[in-house]
């Protein structure tokens, strides 16, 4: 299992980002500790690139998303 940190800047006021939030929640067990930050636990086959590419479908022009593996190397 791998933990990923997902952070974003959503630039479009009033835009409905429920698809983005649902896509993040569908990745696995999740926590939403800050307004634009999530931590998700995924299976070992998931990569940061896969997550980012999936989430980009729900972003508007100018929106940014950052995905990084934060699992320990143990």
Region spans (language model):
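Extended, hydrophobic alpha-helical segments
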Residues: 1-32, 37-46
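Short, intrinsically disordered low-complexity segments
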Residues: 27-74
């Amino acid at each position: 299992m791998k933990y990923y940190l997902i952070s974003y800047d959503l630039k479009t006021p009033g835009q409905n980002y429920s698809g983005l939030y649902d896509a993040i929640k569908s990745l696995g067990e999740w926590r939403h500790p800050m307004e634009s930050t999530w931590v998700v636990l995924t299976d070992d086959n998931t990569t940061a690139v896969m997550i980012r590419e999936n989430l980009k479908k729900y972003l508007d022009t100018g929106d940014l998303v950052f995905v990084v593996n934060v699992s320990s190397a143990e």
